[in-house]
From Swiss-Prot:
Similarity comment text for this entry: Belongs to the RNA 3'-terminal cyclase family. Type 2 subfamily.
SUPFAM superfamilies in the record: EPT/RTPC-like
General function of this protein: As part of the small subunit (SSU) processome, it plays a role in 40S-ribosomal-subunit biogenesis in the early pre-rRNA processing steps at sites A0, A1 and A2 that are required for proper maturation of the 18S RNA. Activates BMS1 by promoting GDP/GTP exchange. Does not have cyclase activity.
Subunit (UniProt): Part of the small subunit (SSU) processome, composed of more than 70 proteins and the RNA chaperone small nucleolar RNA (snoRNA) U3. Interacts with BMS1.
Record organism: Homo sapiens (Human)
GO cellular component terms given for this protein: nucleolus; nucleoplasm; small-subunit processome
Predominant location: nucleus
Keywords: Nucleus, Ribosome biogenesis
Cellular compartment(s): Nucleus, Nucleolus
BP GO terms, sorted: endonucleolytic cleavage in 5'-ETS of tricistronic rRNA transcript (SSU-rRNA, 5.8S rRNA, LSU-rRNA); endonucleolytic cleavage in ITS1 to separate SSU-rRNA from 5.8S rRNA and LSU-rRNA from tricistronic rRNA transcript (SSU-rRNA, 5.8S rRNA, LSU-rRNA); endonucleolytic cleavage of tricistronic rRNA transcript (SSU-rRNA, 5.8S rRNA, LSU-rRNA); ribosomal small subunit biogenesis
Pfam families: RTC, RTC_insert
Protein name as it appears in the record: RNA 3'-terminal phosphate cyclase-like protein
Amino acid sequence: MATQAHSLSYAGCNFLRQRLVLSTLSGRPVKIRKIRARDDNPGLRDFEASFIRLLDKITNGSRIEINQTGTTLYYQPGLLYGGSVEHDCSVLRGIGYYLESLLCLAPFMKHPLKIVLRGVTNDQVDPSVDVLKATALPLLKQFGIDGESFELKIVRRGMPPGGGGEVVFSCPVRKVLKPIQLTDPGKIKRIRGMAYSVRVSPQMANRIVDSARSILNKFIPDIYIYTDHMKGVNSGKSPGFGLSLVAETTSGTFLSAELASNPQGQGAAVLPEDLGRNCARLLLEEIYRGGCVDSTNQSLALLLMTLGQQDVSKVLLGPLSPYTIEFLRHLKSFFQIMFKIETKPCGEELKGGDKVLMTCVGIGFSNLSKTLK
């Protein structure tokens, strides 16, 4: 295994997931110092510790050292093993926090991954499971990750602060990834959505749908928003409601937006009408930003392009989010790869905001964990 000399060193608690995921894929150890060192409550938070435990479950032979105060972490990655795993996520963050990283790692396991995650399915901070199902899964399919065993299923919903949700994610393994050419975002052809309500009146979901449609109907007739009212044990432990919207384009691109109500006992109560209208506006804003991948999944697309065969991949993105910009810096540190970035100013055709064309040659990453049959 690599020695401490090869390890990368970082300071601070930001982008912890990016660093650990890229460390696992590249096999380079990472040392992170000064994790909230000056905070009143220093060190790793519960949800970060839970994430490290999850990495430990899906890998074989990882070495994790955390000091007494939790302010320094040394991670020496093992091999991605996969198999059947269960994990109780921290209710401080959504399941999306954990799932985003699993989507990056799952195709490179030794055995196909089948994981049950329990916790908060929809919150105001992380991408909800609904949005990841509607946008990230089709993106992975573009890279050739597909099959009957590729699914993400919501068994129970759970809202903060109590949680109680449950999702099942299964993903096949791939030896190599296909290069992609996603340069034509296409035009919006349909909008689909999911209005959910748990432990409140089912009427809430209908009120959300009506208000969201009142805005979106001005632009396109093909809108269908499903209502999902889970009852009993399937509704988790806390009341709440929310909406996720996904716009599909003629070239198979998915752009998403979502909103959830305030957690029980925190902040003012949100009117379902306001939530529906605001979510519809967020979707219009995402469509304005445009690109072939929505802002939630920019970093996932760039990672899979990096790990592809030694061939050119291109993707047209909207404005890069700060998270994606930092991710590009990390890709350079871990994989020594740099993207060619061309700005494409919006023309006269009312195509929305300025776009960025990202081009790279894959490093020809071969799944070392997967044994040859």
